From Swiss-Prot:
UniProt-annotated binding residues for ATP: 386-388, 410-415, 499, 514, 525
Gene coding for it: acsA
Its biological purpose: Catalyzes the conversion of acetate into acetyl-CoA (AcCoA), an essential intermediate at the junction of anabolic and catabolic pathways. AcsA undergoes a two-step reaction. In the first half reaction, AcsA combines acetate with ATP to form acetyl-adenylate (AcAMP) intermediate. In the second half reaction, it can then transfer the acetyl group from AcAMP to the sulfhydryl group of CoA, forming the product AcCoA.
Cofactor(s), names only, from the UniProt record: Mg(2+)
Chain sites annotated for binding CoA: 191-194, 310, 334, 522, 583
Species of provenance: Aeromonas hydrophila subsp. hydrophila (strain ATCC 7966 / DSM 30187 / BCRC 13018 / CCUG 14551 / JCM 1027 / KCTC 2358 / NCIMB 9240 / NCTC 8049)
Residues with the N6-acetyllysine modification: 608
Pfam families membership: ACAS_N, AMP-binding, AMP-binding_C
Protein name per Swiss-Prot or TrEMBL: Acetyl-coenzyme A synthetase
Length: 648
């Protein structure tokens, strides 16, 4: 095997695993040779109100991109996550909630969760929400976030969740684009001991005249002081007190929309990624089962926020469709103590842990403090998600958190893919630190050069997927042309992931990072164009260019080149003001780590900014700038290098 270190499958894992090597090979072969037969069979993992007769109807043809799975089947997501478990698992714990404060926790059984979901579904109906309407959620990490999601699916409404860390401006943009007329929020969230002003942000977002919101349902989380609008605002607890707990699930078409989730692209405006009902849930359910080698007695903890796709697929829908116990954590992994994550593992006897490299690196920086006074002996499987994990962090996670006992499923996927595409399987895959290894069933990755020519064998190139899978996004909400343009125009006939990858002699994939203008900051995607447009909207900024630089905790940091308008001078105050400005426009995750005051930017004669050169300068690789003769003013490069050394 290539690469320096290989960790073979351990006997104690393979003995009880759902799949072994031969089983995986046979299923994978079947999935690509006859997708209709394979996915027709796998679709039975769900309960259908009307069984499908058609399975795969997809086209990647230029100008005719269309993705449909199970299109004549009818089902309901909440019925698959709740109702079907009531007879056998009604008293099993569905959600364990662990508060920001370690003294606070709650458990909800499947029966209790079902009751709460039915009630809140009736609340939505009473507020005039109909099938197909978009409901915006701007919630803290509390069980009510999952209850609201499932209530939407019960009545056929479409949820659009906005991460609680986004600013009022970013929230308003998503409310406007999705056409939401109702927002569900809380008075405040809690994170790391600090309140998050959710209701205040909603109030501010709704001052935008383009928003058309009639109702705001407010959960009382902290009891903090908030402004109240009698004509519009409703307390969650008041609304659920007067409704019936009986709400039959709506029969939805497999291709009816399930949710919209906004994600950054390489052009400025965030895209509303649209997922539909049947294929998405089949894929989330199946990937959860096999990738985490799920067994009935497992206690599963995914540390992601519901505001990100990982929270949708692997905190709520995948686990609950499998009848699992899923942990929802309000806090952060190092509060109030560095060993909080390990404490939670022990407290709830977590057997499967799914977290992000950013969290792992932050804990690694604290060494053994991260595991002090904890045993973590309940852990069986560990996972990584959000960005490629560097081998050093992988090794630390494996040795220190998992004590060399637990295989690590290093999962690669995207908001657009609905579920995991490339990942080890615990009983199947020999592990290599830093590699996402092999594709899941039905996933056909390929590497191509910049001209789109396929690259064979051990090589490096642009990562594309050559055929559809059930969890794939169907379109960009309200803009199918942008969907085709973004994902299918670079390499016609193939889905372009925007990532580069390396394939080794064993056919293992190693994700090398974005090849487009998208950053991965702490596992969160940020389009450089989005940050740049926030910067240039500042009255004193004439021009800005943003690139990613390596960051030892966040993976990538944000390096902003900023040119001021004539007559303005850089200052410490302005530096602070610009950072605050971006935080207000987008949210704290978009705050630049470095602001480089630049007299000018390197441009081609046609006016295109040469980001390749800016990346090299930002990372100090000034001896390999390549050809700069095409620049309108090559002298600008020396100036930038000089400015950087002066700033340092």
């Amino acid at each position: 095997m290539s690469e320096s270190k290989v960790y073979p499958v351990k006997a104690h894992i393979s003995n009880g695993a759902l799949l072994d090597k031969a089983g995986y090979e046979a299923m994978y072969r079947a999935s690509v040779q006859d997708p209709d037969a394979f996915w027709g069979e796998q679709g039975k993992i769900l309960d259908w109100m009307k069984p499908y007769t058609r399975v795969k109807n997809t086209s990647y043809d230029p100008g005719h991109v269309s993705i449909k799975w199970y299109e004549d089947g009818l089902l309901n997501v909440s019925a698959n996550c709740l109702d079907r478990h009531l007879a056998q698992r009604g008293d099993k714990v569905a959600i364990i909630w662990e508060g920001d404060n370690p003294a606070e926790d709650r458990k909800l059984t499947y029966r209790e969760l079902h009751t709460e979901v039915c009630k809140f579904a009736n609340v939505l109906k009473a507020q005039g929400v109909h099938r197909g309407d978009v409901v915006c959620l701007y919630m803290p990490m509390v069980p009510e976030a999952a209850i609201a999601m499932l209530a939407c699916t019960r009545i056929g409404a479409v949820h659009s969740i906005v991460f609680g860390g986004f600013s009022p401006e970013a929230l308003a943009g998503r409310i406007i684009d999705s056409g939401s007329s109702i927002v569900i929020t809380a008075d405040e969230g809690l994170r790391g001991g600090r309140p998050v002003p959710l209701k205040k942000n909603v109030d501010e977002a709704l001052t935008n005249p383009e928003t058309k919101v009639n109702n705001v349902i407010v959960l009382k989380r902290t009891g903090g002081n908030i402004a109240w609008h009698n004509h519009r605002d409703i307390w969650w607890h008041d609304a659920v007190a007067t409704v019936s707990a009986d709400c039959p699930p709506e029969a939805m078409g497999a291709e009816d929309p399930l949710f919209i989730l906004y994600t950054s692209g390489s052009t400025g405006k965030p895209k509303g990624v649209l997922h539909t009902t049947g294929g998405y849930l089949v894929y989330a359910t199946l990937t959860f089962k096999y990738i985490f080698d799920y067994h009935e007695e497992d206690i599963y903890w995914c540390t992601a926020d519901v505001g990100w796709v990982t929270g949708h697929s692997y905190l709520v829908y995948g686990p609950l469709a499998n009848g699992a116990t899923t942990i929802m954590f309000e806090g952060v992994p190092n509060y109030p103590a560095t060993n909080r994550m390990s404490q939670v593992v022990d407290k709830h006897q977590v057997s499967i842990l799914y977290t992000a490299p950013t969290a792992i690196r932050a804990l690694m920086a604290k060494g053994n403090e991260a595991v002090a006074d904890t045993s973590r002996s309940s852990l069986r499987i560990m996972g990584s998600v959000g960005e490629p994990i560097n081998p050093e962090a992988w090794e630390w996670y494996y040795r220190t958190i998992g004590e060399e006992r637990c295989p690590i499923v290093d999962t690669w996927w995207q908001t657009e893919t609905g579920g995991i595409l490339i990942s080890p399987l615990p009983g199947v895959t020999d592990l290599k630190p830093g590699s996402a290894t092999r594709p899941f069933f039905g996933v056909q990755p390929a590497l191509v050069d910049n001209m789109g020519e396929p690259l064979e064998g051990a090589t490096e190139g642009n990562l594309v997927i050559t055929d559809s899978w059930p969890g794939q996004m169907r379109t960009v909400f309200g803009d199918h042309e942008r969907f085709e343009q973004t994902y299918f125009s670079t390499f016609p006939g193939r889905y372009f992931t925007g990532d580069g990858a390396r394939r080794d002699e064993d056919g293992y994939y190693w994700i090398t990072g974005r090849v487009d203008d998208v950053l991965n900051v702490s596992g969160h995607r940020m389009g450089t164009a989005e940050i740049e447009s926030a910067l240039v909207s500042h009255p004193k900024i004439a021009e800005a260019a943003v690139v990613g630089v390596p960051h030892e905790i966040k993976g990538q940091g944000i390096y902003a080149y900023v040119t001021l308008i004539a007559g303005e001078e850089p200052s410490r105050e302005l530096h602070k003001e610009v950072k605050e400005w971006v935080r207000k426009e987008i949210g704290a995750i978009a705050t630049p780590d470095v602001i480089h005051w630049a007299e000018g930017l390197p441009k081609t004669r046609s006016g295109k900014i040469m980001r390749r050169i800016l990346r090299k300068i930002a990372t100090g690789e000034t001896d390999s700038l390549g050809d700069i003769s095409t620049l309108a003013d090559p002298g600008v490069v020396d100036k930038l290098i000089r400015e950087k050394s002066e700033a340092a």
